[in-house]
Amino acid sequence: MALIDVIGWVGKRRWARSVGVPMMLAARRIPLATMVRLAGRRICIPSAGYSAIALSGTSVRDNLCDGALMFETLAGAIERFGLEADGTASDLTIEPQACGCPVTMPDYDTPYVSEHPVSTLEDIRALEVPDPLTDTRMRAMVETVRRLSERFTLLTVAGGSGPFTLAAELIGATEAAIYTLTEPALMHELLEYCTRVCATYLDAIVRAGAEVILIGEPTAAILSPGAYAEFSGAYTARLIAAIPRPVILHICGDAGHLVKGMCETGAQGLSLDAPVDLPSVAQTVPDNVVLIGNLDTVSVLLEGTPESVSESTTEMLESMRPYKNHVASSGCDLSYNTPVENIVAMIDTVRDFR
């Protein structure tokens, strides 16, 4: 039995907590890449938070506003899928809403920011840093993490927005891109504020029991390497330096041009989307940085069959066989409507791969 299987077996059993807790405390002293190499086989961590909600028969809206319900939803998915880590559903509207952005929250789809309230320097200076323990939705996520860490001794993965992505929600993505060229001083002041918000929220997530932090910086994909270094990477690096846990950095879409800059942030793991050629990237990424991904969430996992998912998963694993710093995952968050049998096919294929 591989070490990751032992950890998973212990981590799911309440009565084994006296063994699991010391294991998790020991894991905090080990770099993420070392943990991956010691696992004994390839690890699979699909971004299945929204699929877990579908499996539970509850709504996205209810889960993202109720920490206790989200915990029950995720606990059910851990048991159903036999997940090797527990993690919250990705929701990058939490911080924007706490900062004053109106958010539309469908019952069965991902929420989104519907208005961008910031447009001037005066608007930025009027913003306050929300308290994660009193803001309703931040508090719900903190509670979910706390309950997960109290119930399971698995690697609890949780996190939030990166500074540039939060800034883009406050001011608008198009405006954020333009202002990096025309109003850089304004953008830097906004990013200073956003970094404080992210740091405060992620500190609460860590204190609640998260073992690995995931920073989602999807909007940074619109930046050139130089602009990324100045307007995202520098702030992300400051954020990571203040977090006493391994950090995974995710950028959606074709972020291949940003991989070098992502490595320079100090992130111990890079989560890359399906458009990125993972084997090519693996040749340039240091072996102490974990590469996570990157099955296509739509054409493979949403629209495929268990047989085609297994085939695509095997192809990915074979292409990454030379690289021991790889963790199999979906390229991005799985859709609410992703068939359960396709998720199971991916997980089982990874577990059986030797």
Feature locations, PLM:
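Aromatic- and acidic-residue-enriched segments that line the glycan-binding/catalytic groove
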Residues: 63-64, 98-112, 165-179
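Catalytic domains of carbohydrate-active enzymes, especially glycoside hydrolases
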Residues: 70-90, 204-211, 264
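Active-site-flanking structural segment that lines cofactor/substrate pockets
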Residues: 51-82
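A contiguous, low-structure linker/loop signature
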Residues: 91-133, 147, 154
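Short, glycine/charge-rich beta-strand/loop segments that flank catalytic centers
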Residues: 88-98, 157-166
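Active-site loop segments of alpha/beta catalytic cores
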Residues: 1-51, 60, 130-354
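Intrinsic-disorder/low-complexity, polar/charged segments
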Residues: 66, 120-121, 135, 305
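Short active-site-proximal "capping" loops at secondary-structure junctions
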Residues: 49-54, 91-95
